Amino acid sequence: HGEYVHTETGKFLTGEQRALFVNGNIVYNGRLFKEIFFEPASPSSSFELKAVTIGRNFHWQRQEDQCFKGAFNLVTGENGIVVINQVDVEEYLTSVISSEMSAQASKELLKAHAVISRSWLLAQIEKNFRLGRKEEKQQNCYRDNEQLIRWYDREDHNIFDVCADDHCQRYQGITRASNPIVQEVIHETRGEILVNGETICDARFSKCCGGVTEQFEHCWEPIPHSYLTALRDSRETTFPDLTQEEEARKWIHSAPNAFCNTADKKILCQVLNNYDQETTDFYRWKVFYKQEELAELIHRKSG
């Protein structure tokens, strides 16, 4: 949609282009590359990727065609070609808040989402910068005589800032922002972030929950964050000690009142994208494993 420029040759491109991954190289127009750069010929130029996998390793995994703006480059990955979209923060957020939630959600919800997602993004970029400068060290495994604690997926992205799927934040292209309110929201919150002292908050969010949030250090990395503590997802603020087995069992086998525990189709249609509405048991659910599946899972996760 519009022209792009292949930066190495200066050639203007329109229409369908094809690149193949062969023996660790990108084959494009009969030549081998490790990386290829494309720049938009105008701000209105956009490109479409075919059969993009979304919801990777989740039960809603599927493929869809997606359209993006901005520059992009193709890079050789371990198992194929990686597409990296170079886009500014506010353009990125326009897609994120209408990919994670529906563009038809209320304006105030989308504004809150924009601030949270902007904060999370900048916190990750800042953290990666510190790690790159070796100002901060990241440890992924802790072991003593009684326990092994292993943290996963924290170093998955070393050639780009964040991925486009649920592992980071959904970034599913410009067509998701179907409501003009999305652009208004990004404009009105431009540059707004959450801070704790002089530090950008590593803000986290979820569409569904179990009725109580977990402390940051028990989910993401063993560093307490005073602004990400255990809270009840309800007007009622008290909850049992869920570190106790019996209390946790009672909580899980019941369905306490919670903001995220709703079956109101009007609300769900307003805030969720179509494929998210396919899942109805998002507050309490069951998963069944065979004995050999559990054994394999424990072996894989424990190393």
Q: What kind of region is each of these model predictions?
A:
Residues 1-303:
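Conserved, single-site charged/polar hotspot
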